Design a protein with these regions (language model features):
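A structural signal for short hydrophobic beta-strand segments in well-ordered beta-sheet cores
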Residues: 131-135
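Active-site-adjacent elements of ketosynthase-type condensing enzymes
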Residues: 121-130
Length: 417
């Protein structure tokens, strides 16, 4: 592909996905219960071959998939994204046994995955998490840990079949003392409660009462779990932007149709300059956000050294743009857009959360600024910065960098997704 356009095959695939979302997935979504995992919808995503693509697609294809689904069915987009977020650490860092047990079931929609990072007192400052993984000597058995504490704002909780859980194995070590665990939902001591959120997706809290885990449950290496989290988020942040772009485009399309047909003041709304200029601004911002999302995803796929900055820029611009565009669309539609069941009423509830989860807008600005200054300092000092996917973030003298190693915090797609 070129820097500023998609290939015909990619455009055709996006059109096919929009049609599938409208014709096959939207009916399944409408039968779901708000706030609950829609297993029929997940099975539909698996049957259509979309869930397996979470593990075979690059970042750009993931963005195209999420944008296209979001345009016609935000519930399908979110169900797919949450499967990817929860299962990507297993795909990228799991053992053969872990992958063999869970990934086929994630791919066909029969197992629900969840990404459990945020806590009541550790959202944006994710490195401050306190879920304790206390050593469990287990006389006569393999040594392990006991998980004690809470997770909150966890998408797909408490109905998920397994959780990627991030817990503190080394107290006082900050981001360097966190380990990622694969925790099946049936482990003794693990309980959860649903949370009633603005948007209709399943969100919950988890309580860990000495939940047993072993070395066989570790994803990656002990005390290196924050790299697992940040590697996952660097992949998914641009595609959160794609989700936002899909919603913005849906709102823009609805606004074009409405203003072209609506009679007011002796003519059509489209003929009023104040309306036309607002529509033009909505289109300008949507297309700008789309291009930045595609650029960030392409940088990830190319192994570019500035992925954390580009991913943060893409998520920030796209989610803020979608909020603006949907709000303008509601304004131009008037009261009808606030009626329960209207497309824009639905989008208005959906569009708010992406500015919070997987790194709030304020966090993204912090990442961008730190990356800019880190690059400036690295140039001046002649040091290497981040690895191609941005997950290591180590200079040549072996010191960890902020944001590249993930010290810029996150609230994952757990907060009102």
């Amino acid at each position: 592909m070129t820097a500023f356009s998609l290939e015909p095959a990619q455009l055709a695939w996006c059109a096919e996905l929009r049609a599938l979302a409208a014709e096959r997935l939207r009916p399944l979504a409408e039968k779901g219960e708000p706030g609950r995992v829609n297993r029929a919808l997940l099975a539909g995503l698996g049957t259509l071959g979309l869930l397996p693509r979470l593990f075979t697609s690059g970042a750009l294809d993931l963005c195209l998939m999420r944008e296209s689904l979001a345009h016609a069915c935000t519930e399908a987009e979110t169900a797919l994204a949450l499967q990817g977020l929860g299962a990507h650490p297993v795909h990228a860092h799991g053992t053969e046994a872990q992958r063999a047990r869970w990934l086929p079931r994630v791919s066909d929609g029969s197992a629900v995955a969840a990404f459990a990072l945020s806590e009541p007192d550790a959202g944006s400052d994710a490195a401050a998490l306190t879920l304790a993984a206390d050593p469990d000597p287990r006389p006569g058995g393999s040594p392990g840990w006991r998980l004690t504490g809470e997770k909150r704002w966890i998408s797909n909780a408490p109905e998920a079949d397994f959780y990627t859980v991030f817990a503190r194995t080394t107290p006082g070590a900050g981001a360097r003392g966190i380990t990622a665990f694969l925790v099946p939902a049936d482990r003794p001591g693990l309980t959860g409660t649903p949370l009633d959120m603005l948007s209709p997706h399943p969100i919950g809290a988890l309580a860990f009462d000495a939940v047993p885990v072993t070395p066989d449950d570790v994803l990656g290496e002990p005390d290196r779990g924050f790299r697992v989290a940040m590697g996952t988020l660097n992949l998914f942040r641009p595609s959160v932007g794609a989700f936002a772009v899909g919603m913005a485009q849906a709102a823009l399309d609805a606004t074009l149709a409405h203003t072209a047909a609506r009679d007011a003041f002796g003519g059509k709304l489209r003929d009023l300059q104040t309306v036309a200029h607002q529509v033009a601004e909505m289109a300008l911002r949507t297309e700008s956000a789309r291009l930045m999302v595609y650029a960030a995803a392409t940088a990830y796929d190319d192994g570019a050294p500035d992925v954390p900055r580009r991913a943060a820029m893409a998520k920030l611009l796209a989610t803020e743009t979608a909020q603006y565009v949907v709000d303008r669309a509601v304004q131009l539609h008037g009261a009808r857009a606030l009626c329960r069941g209207h497309l824009l009423e639905h989008l208005y509830r959906e569009v708010r959360a992406p500015r919070v989860y997987e790194g709030a807008s304020e966090v993204q600005r912090g990442i961008i600024a730190k990356e800019l200054y880190r690059t400036l300092d690295a140039t001046a000092n002649g040091t290497a910065g981040v690895t191609a996917n941005g997950t290591a973030g180590v200079t040549t003298n072996g010191t960890a960098n902020a944001t590249a190693n993930g010290t810029a915090g996150v609230t994952t797609k757990e907060a009102g997704a």
